[in-house]
Amino acid sequence: MNGLFDTYHIRRAFSRAAHSYDTNAVLQHEVEQRLLESLDYLGDRIPRVILDVGAGTGRASIAMKKRWPKAQVIALDQAMPMLQEARKRSHWWNPLALIYGDARTLPVADASVDVIFSNLCLQWIEDLPTVFAGFRQALRPGGLLLCSLFGPDTLIELRQAFAQADAVPHISPFPSMPQCGDALVLAHFQNPVLDRDLFTLTYDDLSALMRSLRAIGATNALQERRTTLTGRGRFAATAAAYETLRNADNKLPSSWEVIYACAWAPTSEPMTRENNHEIASIPINSIPIRRRNSS
């Protein structure tokens, strides 16, 4: 096995979570709604083809189909049971196009898509520059990319608690905002704008948090993870370390950092160049972190 992530494990985890996902993905739905609102960047433009990468159960795809009924909305996911859930939501008189596929190798023609939308999918891919380059290639000139992904402060409390129990990695190394911005620039996207939120969810205990993660398919997919069950001793040590963070409401907090990115595929006009390098601005300095609490 090569690479940081076990892609087979990721596919299997999300396949198993297909039936429980929507009931438990409260945060994912909130982020999805915020990303959908960012489609206003299109102004009066009406997209003909929209690609939803990592579409899951198809909620966002259906929302975009409702907004632009004449557009072809393609829901792409690597977990077939997720697409089966999306098919149940899709209206027979104006259906989605459902495609089983991977964000790393988009099964669409070059310059054929007006909008690529991807909600909380790309943190499972280690080579963001290559993936973004594939997105740019699929977009028509001037096409829009809107995506969200988890940042490095996601599950930081759980990461630290596990670290006190053993030295085996349990949480993925999520990309930072500068890394996302650099990846967009390397892929030659224009005018990238990034933002972020820091959400705090709360749980009764560690077991409740772990059940919630399994229900949305967010399990440890690292290649170097321990493949045997976590022993009672290690789990107890992790739980004890986490207990020190219990808040005034007698709940355990769990941080989720979300990075949002908006960028445009180049038009036929060349980008600004300086010293033989293409220049793009990324306004990431002084971006506020908005803290939101939900339980």
Swiss-Prot record:
CDD domains: AdoMet_MTases. Its EC number is 2.1.1.197. Keywords: Biotin biosynthesis, Methyltransferase, S-adenosyl-L-methionine, Transferase. One of its GO terms (molecular function) is carboxyl-O-methyltransferase activity. It catalyses: malonyl-[ACP] + S-adenosyl-L-methionine = malonyl-[ACP] methyl ester + S-adenosyl-L-homocysteine. It comes from Xylella fastidiosa (strain M23). Belongs to the methyltransferase superfamily. Converts the free carboxyl group of a malonyl-thioester to its methyl ester by transfer of a methyl group from S-adenosyl-L-methionine (SAM). It allows to synthesize pimeloyl-ACP via the fatty acid synthetic pathway. Pathway: Cofactor biosynthesis; biotin biosynthesis. This is Malonyl-[acyl-carrier protein] O-methyltransferase. GO terms for biological process: biotin biosynthetic process; methylation. The keyword Transferase applies. It comes from the Bacteria. SUPFAM superfamilies: S-adenosyl-L-methionine-dependent methyltransferases.
